[in-house]
Design a protein with these regions (language model features):
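A short, active-site helix/loop in glycosyltransferases that binds the activated sugar's phosphate group
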Residues: 1-29, 38, 73
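A conserved nucleotide-sugar
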Residues: 54, 72-100
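Conserved donor-binding/catalytic core segment of Leloir-type glycosyltransferases
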Residues: 32, 36, 40-66, 72
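Acidic donor-binding loop of glycosyltransferase active sites
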Residues: 104-117, 130
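A charged, aromatic-enriched C-terminal amphipathic alpha-helix characteristic of glycosyltransferases
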Residues: 174-205
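Short alpha-helical segment that forms part of, or immediately flanks, the ligand-binding pocket
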Residues: 100, 122-127, 141-142
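Short hydrophobic beta-strand element within catalytic cores of glycosyltransferases
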Residues: 131-138
């Protein structure tokens, strides 16, 4: 609180942070998206797969915070119901390099059940063309003034909703190329690291 009161400006990189600060510091709070350097990222638009490859990363110490403790059992229910139409790739407490390698082959990533917006991890996945099932509320699109792209499969923190969204993907695999292409476009449009860096510089110089 003391830092927020005495600083010249506040930059919120997520909608969640923005709505927390803006009521109290409306004159010095701004929103600037997270930066993604995709210069070394291989972007690949997914084709319609024979089997949907669902990817879930689990950090044992943070499973309840990220919601993977709820999503993972539901994902296994889907795989049990549709064994010939989907498979699961898990990264449990995996080193970052291995985690990224496993993500590269995924069609859909499950991440951040309780979030309104995509995390850094989700944005990295999207930059690769991986579809994210996680936080993607309308507030996320409104704050960046995105009118058309809707690449994120938004999910609510309920087992029923998670099941329905996962089942929708399995039964509508033809949408995977479209959502994958939108994911790449979304990151390049709103999270270009050079563009974001310039926004930081502009805000700094103005304050």
């Amino acid at each position: 609180k003391e830092i927020a009161q005495t600083c010249n400006g506040i930059i919120a990189c997520l909608w969640e942070y923005y709505v927390a600060y803006i009521p109290y510091f409306p004159d010095k709070t701004t929103f600037i998206p997270l930066p993604i350097d995709y210069s070394n990222i291989t972007s690949r638009v997914r084709t319609e797969p024979e089997k949907v490859n669902f990817f879930i990363g689990i950090q044992s110490a943070r499973s309840d915070i990220k919601g993977t403790d709820i999503m993972y059992p539901v994902l296994k229910e889907i795989q049990k119901k549709y064994p010939d139409q989907c498979r699961i790739t898990e990264a449990i407490d995996a080193p970052y390099a291995i985690y990224q390698k496993l993500m590269d082959d995924a069609d859909v990533q499950l991440d951040q059940l309780y979030s309104y917006t995509p995390s850094m991890n989700s944005l990295l996945a999207m930059a690769k063309g991986v579809i994210v099932l996680g936080g993607g509320e309308e507030e996320n699109y409104e704050i960046i003034n995105e009118k058309e792209l809707r690449p994120i499969i938004n999910v609510y923190p309920s087992e029923e909703d998670i099941f329905q969204k996962l089942e929708y993907i399995v039964l509508n695999k033809e949408r995977i190329p479209e959502l994958s292409a939108q994911s790449i476009e979304y990151v390049r449009k709103h999270h270009n690291y050079v563009k974001v860096a310039q926004q930081y510089v502009d805000f700094w110089e103005a304050h």
